[in-house]
Regions:
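Active-site His/acidic residue clusters
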Residues: 41-42, 46-52, 58, 92-137, ...
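Catalytic-site neighborhoods of secreted/periplasmic enzymes
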Residues: 1-74, 173
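Catalytic-adjacent loop/helix segments of enzymes that bind and process anionic phosphate/sulfate esters
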Residues: 8, 76-106
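Long, internal low-complexity/basic segments
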Residues: 229, 291, 300-310, 314-377
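Substrate-binding rim/cap in mid-to-C-terminal beta-strand-loop elements of soluble/periplasmic
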Residues: 39, 146-155, 181-246, 250-261, ...
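Histidine-centered active-site microenvironments of extracellular/periplasmic hydrolases
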Residues: 9-19, 23-24, 118-121, 127-133, ...
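Loop/turn elements at helix/coil->beta-strand transitions in domains of secreted/extracellular proteins
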Residues: 26-29, 101-108, 156-163, 204-205, ...
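Short, solvent-exposed turn/loop segments enriched in Gly/Ser/Thr/Pro and often Arg
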Residues: 1-7, 34-38, 108-118, 165-172, ...
């Protein structure tokens, strides 16, 4: 609706008008969901290109307890935050059931509101774990997966359905992590940092693929990213990508079909504050001295205490405890990684292909400065 950042308030919006440039304008036949994450207004359900109920009341902000974070704003008459996740699950199961007798393939993209803030496990899941509401909320996600698998199996569609389970980032460090760690649960496992940080705890995610008859209980350690699903689906469907399509996406169809490996050799990460890093299968070069997110060091005065760049051997040191940026044994690798990052920025892409323009105003001075120092330009 474009009410933020341009002087308009939400009260100026006519919610009865169709939504433009939404999912149904971007290739989806049907959509049911919410406009943003559950803590951000307007608090309405959107079905296709219309809200299901015109906002008629206000949900007050709740920012004292970050686990229950709500920024506050207008809400529809049929909208209750604690019912949102169950409603999305219900619509998803209905959609799967509607495809029961169809001979055509179907695609369901299910970006759930859990376990993002506010942490609101349904009553039947409260107290299911010993680590508090967040753990209960995660169990609720597990049950969602159970329901989807059960429905596919009931409809005799499980054997020819590919299920992908993933996350957009690591666990948020502000949702009661310290209390969970005291109880023996470590959301980031052995990895450093959390959501928004440049470190592994912010970027390593679960990526589980289920394909009946293709996989047993196996693990693949190839370097892949969620953005690789674009090129992967294109290859799977024999779709020829245009020059400016999927400029950072490498197909992992060879991995999923068990016919080979991905062509990806490195991967760019971005922290919440925009700082970049480049990783290979062994090394991770961070173009900044801090976390770039919420974890120490964050304040400029603290970041200044450390070298302006960070280098980690993520094979030998997956917890990123030792910054080896000054180790001469890695001088050549660091030079090559710097050159690669500069090339990606200049070419507007990290895949082979014609040079394209970047679709952002970010100049990535952090990268340019280090490259100037390296090459004397």
């Amino acid at each position: 609706w474009g009410y933020t950042g341009n002087g308009r308030s939400m009260k100026d919006i006519d919610f009865s008008l169709p939504i433009k440039n939404g999912p149904t304008d971007r290739g989806f036949n049907y959509y049911f969901g919410i406009p943003a994450s559950l803590d951000i207004s307007p608090y309405v359900y959107v079905e296709n290109d219309e809200v299901t109920s015109i906002p008629d009341h206000v949900i007050e902000p709740q920012k004292k307890n970050l686990a229950l974070l709500m920024h506050g704003g207008m809400a529809g008459a049929d909208f209750k935050p604690e019912e949102c996740f169950p409603n999305i699950i219900r619509h998803s199961l209905n959609y799967i059931n509607e495809q029961k007798d169809s001979k055509k393939p179907f695609f369901l993209y299910l970006p759930i509101t859990a376990p993002h803030t506010p942490i609101l496990p349904s009553k039947e899941f409260q107290g299911k774990t010993s680590i508090g509401p967040y753990g209960d909320f995660v169990v609720m996600i597990d049950d969602m997966v159970r329901q989807i698998v059960k429905t596919l199996k009931k409809n005799k569609q499980l054997d020819n359905t590919i299920i992908v389970f993933a996350s957009d980032n690591g666990c948020a460090g502000y949702i009661g992590v310290k209390d969970m760690e005291k109880k023996g649960h470590f959301p980031s496992y052995i990895y450093r940092g959390y959501k928004s940080d440049i470190y592994e705890g912010g970027h390593r995610i679960p990526l589980i693929v289920s394909w009946k008859g293709k996989y047993g209980k196996e693990t693949n350690n190839s370097l892949v990213s969620l953005i690789d699903f674009y090129a992967t689906f294109a290859q799977m469907l024999n779709h020829n990508l245009e020059t400016e399509e999927a400029v950072d996406s490498y197909s992992m169809w060879s991995i999923l079909s068990k016919k080979g490996t991905s062509a990806r050799k490195d991967l760019v990460h971005e922290a919440g504050e925009g700082y970049l890093s480049l990783r290979t299968s062994q090394l991770k070069l961070v173009f900044y001295g801090g976390s770039g997110g919420f974890s120490y060091p964050v304040k400029p005065s603290d970041v200044a205490k450390f070298p302006p760049m960070q280098l980690f051997d993520i094979v030998k040191d997956p917890s990123e405890k030792e910054n080896i940026i000054g180790d001469k044994r890695y001088e050549n690798e660091v030079k090559e990684m710097k050159r690669a990052m500069k090339q990606y920025v200049e070419n507007g892409r990290s895949t082979p292909g014609e040079k394209v323009s970047n679709d952002t105003k970010n100049s990535w001075n952090q990268v340019k400065i280090f490259m100037q120092e390296e090459e004397g330009i």
